[in-house]
Regions:
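Residue-level recognition of pore/gate-forming positions within transmembrane alpha-helices
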Residues: 13, 61, 87-90, 111-112, ...
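Alpha-helical transmembrane segments of multipass membrane proteins
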Residues: 16, 20, 64, 114-115, ...
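Interhelical loop and helix-boundary elements at the membrane-water interface
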Residues: 26, 30-56, 90-110, 155-180, ...
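Alpha-helical transmembrane segments
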Residues: 5-16, 131-142, 198-205
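Intramembrane alpha-helical segments
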Residues: 11-13, 19, 38-134, 217-221
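Terminal RNA-binding accessory module
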Residues: 204-213
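Multi-pass membrane catalytic core of lipid/isoprenoid biosynthesis enzymes
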Residues: 3-13, 29-83, 160-199
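Active-site alpha-helical segments that house and flank conserved acidic catalytic motifs
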Residues: 13-26, 138-152
Length: 245
């Protein structure tokens, strides 16, 4: 794709991600005060006025809409439809921990649109592509896996506050579930790369990333509390591995 399209996709992805983070902190500001990992967040501390936060959220959503409207004419309507479908789960995800045992599934669905919208923007069909299906599944599985690890950091506080998460729901099977997600994500990416006919250079990166994903779970414990830094390090490893791919 042309560089201009790549830049638009990056801008749209960053603006939507930022909007989702703001929505999350708005929903959870009262709970965040009671959770060790999040109690220092600006909204939890009351350091930012709510009005300013809502203004920032609206501006970021408008920027995201402008990005969609700036996409190529032939594919704009499809991308707009996908963006509108993505909006409800993005805004509702923070509430999912109140009513759904696996809120990380909702987050995974949100990130799945980060595959579908750029794909549609290039004019590629949304049906019948092994590469698209592989990338989409890998994104869902990887997101569910790493956000489950993130939720492991909050298990004690979440249980006390009556909140739900996949880390709590999976209990002693938590780490094995994360490993399975990572293995299936790597396999899905392999199918996607095979369908796209990628060169040997990618497969070297894929191998390093696949091994790295599994190795990053070695120090995790399904039920025993661990230092917060362990979960943060795991999350940063996923960022680097994703960048490699």
């Amino acid at each position: 794709p042309p560089a201009s399209l790549v830049l638009l996709i990056l801008l749209g992805g960053l603006s939507v991600s930022a909007a989702g983070c703001i929505a999350n902190d708005l929903w959870d500001r009262r709970f965040d005060r009671e959770v060790a990992r999040t109690r220092e967040r600006p909204l939890a501390q009351g350091m930012i006025p709510l009005q300013a936060t809502f203004v920032a959220l609206v501006l970021l959503l408008l920027l995201s809409l402008l990005v969609v409207l700036a996409l190529p004419d032939r594919h704009r309507l499809t991308c707009l439809g996908l963006a509108l479908l993505a909006l409800p789960p993005i805004l509702l995800y923070p509430s999912a921990k109140r009513w759904f045992a696996y809120p990380q599934m909702v987050l995974a669905l949100c990130w799945g649109f980060a595959v579908l919208i750029p794909w549609a923007a290039t004019g590629a069909p949304l049906v019948g592509s092994i590469t698209l299906v592989g990338c989409w599944l890998a994104t869902l599985l990887w997101t569910f896996g790493f956000d489950t690890v993130y939720a492991m950091a909050d298990r004690t506080d979440d249980a006390r506050l009556g909140l739900r998460s996949s880390a709590l729901s999976l209990g002693p099977h938590c780490v094995i579930a994360v490993r399975c997600c990572y293995a299936l994500a790597a396999l899905s990416l392999a199918f996607a790369a095979w369908g796209a006919g990628l060169a040997a250079g990618f497969w070297l990166c894929w191998f390093v990333a696949a091994i790295g994903m599994e190795r990053s779970t070695k120090g995790l414990r399904s039920t025993q509390p661990q230092p917060m830094a362990i979960y943060g390090t795991h999350f940063r490893h996923q960022v680097w591995l994703g960048s490699l791919l």
